[in-house]
């Protein structure tokens, strides 16, 4: 019997009941669902590169890349295709199977699309799964990216509809849903999640998950970020999120979206090994690997490989690798930790 069939009609009361289960019961249920759908001892390794940094016109209160706030961020133009491919090649050598490219835009402009499309094509030629996050997408640009071969498009809902206007005013919640719809219409996979710890209530955390799970097709990838407070942003002094609340969010996401990858994204630098291992037990099965995540710190690559080894886990391998030698080397990298830093990653 399937422990958690995919549903798209979750109610507020149902999700609340799951989120508020006794902690041990919640983790047991989430771990059971995870084991029924994934290898519990594999973790997907993704790398995220910032291809254009800062000066974003949006006013997301959590984001140091917003042009509305004074942070110490150095702005960078769209980087050259050749540099992106170089970093993707390094990522593959370090064990990544998925390469994500992010640009601090409200939406990509027509003049940038040829460069963006070329990045996708050349990264895919390396045998890597590709993902981009470029802001809002209309239907035409979504199809253009799909024609270039893009596998995933990331566009987070960020928080619940009820709390959304407390965080962002320059684009609506419906704008985000429309972009996800355009991505689906073009035939790409969806990566969509949110951020917790922005001063929201528990109802907003499970309300976000309800929105994601009730989409016509659930996201194939669900990144759950814990807020990284950055000086100069409006949320720099918000109260810390209780770590058990974060783990509850991971577990509830796993139960509600049993076939999705649940990714530990931003905020891992503030999580000790015990907390991260509990998240893996609760159903998280993907991480961003490397020393930086956009403009914020991420755990050291060596530390990640050491933790994966300590837990007896392995990096997930892709079956369609063009270079079998690289695929075969991933497990050995867990035993022989990477000895050099990755690179600037978004």
From Swiss-Prot:
InterPro entries: Aldolase_TIM, BATS_dom, Biotin_synth/BioAB, Biotin_synthase, Elp3/MiaA/NifB-like_rSAM, rSAM. Its cofactor is [4Fe-4S] cluster; [2Fe-2S] cluster. One of its GO terms (biological process) is biotin biosynthetic process. Keywords: 2Fe-2S, 4Fe-4S, Biotin biosynthesis, Iron, Iron-sulfur, Metal-binding, S-adenosyl-L-methionine, Transferase. GO terms for molecular function: 2 iron, 2 sulfur cluster binding; 4 iron, 4 sulfur cluster binding; biotin synthase activity; iron ion binding. [2Fe-2S] cluster binds at residues 100, 131, 191, 263. CDD domains: Radical_SAM. Its EC number is 2.8.1.6. It catalyses: (4R,5S)-dethiobiotin + (sulfur carrier)-SH + 2 reduced [2Fe-2S]-[ferredoxin] + 2 S-adenosyl-L-methionine = (sulfur carrier)-H + biotin + 2 5'-deoxyadenosine + 2 L-methionine + 2 oxidized [2Fe-2S]-[ferredoxin]. Residues 41-265 form the Radical SAM core domain. Binds 1 [4Fe-4S] cluster. The cluster is coordinated with 3 cysteines and an exchangeable S-adenosyl-L-methionine. Pathway: Cofactor biosynthesis; biotin biosynthesis; biotin from 7,8-diaminononanoate: step 2/2. [4Fe-4S] cluster binds at residues 56, 60, 63. It holds the Pfam family BATS. NCBIfam families: bioB. Catalyzes the conversion of dethiobiotin (DTB) to biotin by the insertion of a sulfur atom into dethiobiotin via a radical-based mechanism. Belongs to the radical SAM superfamily. Biotin synthase family. PANTHER family: BIOTIN SYNTHASE, BIOTIN SYNTHASE, MITOCHONDRIAL. Homodimer. This is Biotin synthase. It comes from Pseudoalteromonas translucida (strain TAC 125). The gene is bioB.
């Amino acid at each position: 019997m399937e422990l958690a069939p995919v549903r798209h009609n979750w109610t507020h009361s149902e999700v609340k009941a799951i989120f508020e289960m006794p902690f041990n019961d919640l983790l047991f249920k989430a771990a059971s669902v995870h084991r029924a759908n994934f290898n519990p001892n594999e973790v997907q390794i993704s790398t995220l590169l910032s291809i254009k940094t800062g000066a974003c016109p949006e006013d997301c209160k959590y984001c140091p890349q917003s042009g509305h706030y004074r942070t110490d961020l150095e702005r960078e133009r769209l980087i050259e295709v050749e540099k992106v491919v170089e970093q993707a090649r390094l990522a593959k050598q370090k064990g990544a199977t998925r390469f994500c490219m992010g640009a601090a835009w409200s939406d990509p402009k027509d003049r940038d699309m040829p460069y963006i499309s070329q990045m996708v094509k050349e990264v895919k030629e390396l045998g890597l799964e590709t993902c981009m996050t470029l802001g809002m997408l209309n239907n035409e640009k979504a199809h253009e990216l799909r024609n270039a071969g893009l596998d995933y498009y990331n566009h987070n809902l960020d928080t619940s509809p009820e709390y959304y206007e407390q965080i962002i005013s320059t684009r609506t919640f419906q704008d985000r849903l429309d972009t996800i719809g355009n991505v689906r219409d073009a035939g790409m996979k969806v990566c969509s999640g949110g951020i917790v710890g922005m001063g929201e209530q528990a109802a907003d955390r499970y309300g976000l998950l309800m929105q994601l799970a009730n989409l016509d097709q659930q996201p194939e990838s669900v990144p759950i970020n814990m807020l990284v407070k950055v000086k100069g942003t409006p949320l720099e002094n918000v109260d810390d999120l209780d770590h058990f609340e974060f783990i509850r969010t991971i577990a509830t996401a796993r139960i509600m979206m049993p076939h999705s990858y649940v990714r530990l994204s931003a905020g891992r630098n503030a999580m000790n090994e015990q907390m991260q291992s509990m998240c893996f037990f609760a159903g998280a099965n993907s991480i961003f690997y490397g020393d930086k995540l956009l403009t914020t710190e991420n755990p050291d690559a060596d530390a990640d490989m050491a933790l994966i080894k300590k837990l007896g886990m392995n990096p997930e391998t892709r079956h369609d690798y063009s270079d079998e030698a690289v695929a075969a080397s991933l497990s050995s990298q867990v035993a022989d930790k990477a000895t050099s830093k990755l690179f600037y990653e978004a």
